[in-house]
């Protein structure tokens, strides 16, 4: 995906190791059915894999990037983090998303102004099955739009062959006029 490619590139740019952890959330029907606690099941799979990896690497603590702004949202994945003893240092230090951006800019990190990019599964309406094919369709559509100059966007999958493109108000006319 575009996010994975970005992560690899940025890790190389800033000189840190990058490791891809394979997960198998599609084997869990509770994830695939896409109920409102989908994130819990996905994060449980991720943190279970990280438990094994951290043990094999003799890593004592797994951190995540949860910040204080995330605490006011519905985030069932936070329960999975708690169950797996994942630490949220940004929350512990009282750091918000705006603080993260400010710190990253001050450290000249290339991602300081990157638009938010929630999980692709969040682009599929609750109750619609999450499938690899649907996620790939959303990812390819978003990548194509980004390559054609659109930023801060979402493509949402709806039942059947319907996709909804969400862009900032100043880009709506370009999408509607098919000026791509």
Put a short name on every predicted segment:
Residues 1-106, 147, 163, 178-180:
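ATP-dependent adenylation/nucleotidyltransferase module used to activate substrates
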Residues 159-160, 164-179:
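A short interface-forming secondary-structure element
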